[in-house]
Design a protein with these regions (language model features):
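Hydrophobic alpha-helical membrane segments
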Residues: 1-249
């Protein structure tokens, strides 16, 4: 399995070209993106099983998103069943990837408990008031511990569903090659993360300015409309990352 090593400029191109792909096929890219989000939200709301079902479904449904983005790039118009394309792949192995991510994230949270006695977990669950921690310097250490565990898990998972379903890699190798590819391509991913951060700040500033100059309702309308563009753009960017790093399937 070969992973291309890309330059810094690809990080911004994934954002710009992702937006261009959405503009080319807004209906299809929006459908697969929001169907993915909606199904996972519904799965997570299931009593007792939701917190397990959603992570297991995540890699399976992500293949449907990638297939939809590939169809949009090729100019094809697939049916609505494309979101379930992952079930035509080795879906049991895909579910194992979801289990890996679930266990890895749980381990990251448990690791923070060893450092702060459950402070960060309490913030996440809403049992601790964030206002009471404004001057809490110890919050930095559990965050660093969480990042030290969660980042490698995310790197191993990032490309793994595509490597398994599109490039026919066993799930263990898919996790390894995903981590390897992310590590070798830290430069464009750094630019990608910084680009998204800058974009978020610029949009937040622009929306606040518009709300102050025109009408506060403008902010509400914009907050409703922006995800309709940004969410498909981000998913399209993920497809472009797979294509650029690993080449045509």
């Amino acid at each position: 399995m070969h992973a291309h090593i890309l330059g810094y400029s690809h990080g911004w191109r994934w954002i710009a070209d992702g937006f261009a792909l959405w503009r080319r096929a807004p209906a299809l890219t929006s459908y697969v993106s929001f169907a993915y989000v909606l199904i996972l939200l519904l799965a997570s709301s299931l009593p007792y099983l939701g917190q397990i079902a959603a992570p297991l479904l995540m890699p399976i449904l992500s293949i449907g998103v990638l297939e939809g983005m590939a169809a949009a790039e090729a100019g094809r118009r697939p049916g609505p069943e494309i979101i379930f394309a992952g079930f035509r792949a080795p879906w049991r192995s895909l579910a194992l990837l979801g289990a890996f991510q679930l266990v890895g994230n749980l381990f990251a949270v448990l690791a923070t408990v060893l450092v702060d006695g459950g402070l960060l977990l309490g913030l996440y669950r809403g049992t601790i008031d964030p206002a009471s921690l404004e001057s809490e310097p110890q919050l930095l250490w559990p965050l660093l511990v969480w990042l030290a565990v969660a980042l490698p898990v995310t790197m191993a998972y990032w490309f793994a569903p595509a490597l398994l379903a599109w490039y026919r890699q066993p799930w263990i190798k898919a996790l390894f090659f995903s981590f390897y590819a992310m590590l070798r391509n830290w430069r464009p991913f750094l630019v990608y993360a910084l680009g998204l951060t800058v974009l978020a700040f610029v949009l937040a500033f622009a929306l606040s300015l518009l709300a102050a100059l025109i009408h506060p309702y403008v902010l509400g309308i914009a907050l409703f409309l922006l995800p309709l563009v940004l969410v498909p753009t981000l998913f399209a960017g993920l497809y472009l990352q797979v294509r650029d790093v690993f080449g045509p399937r």
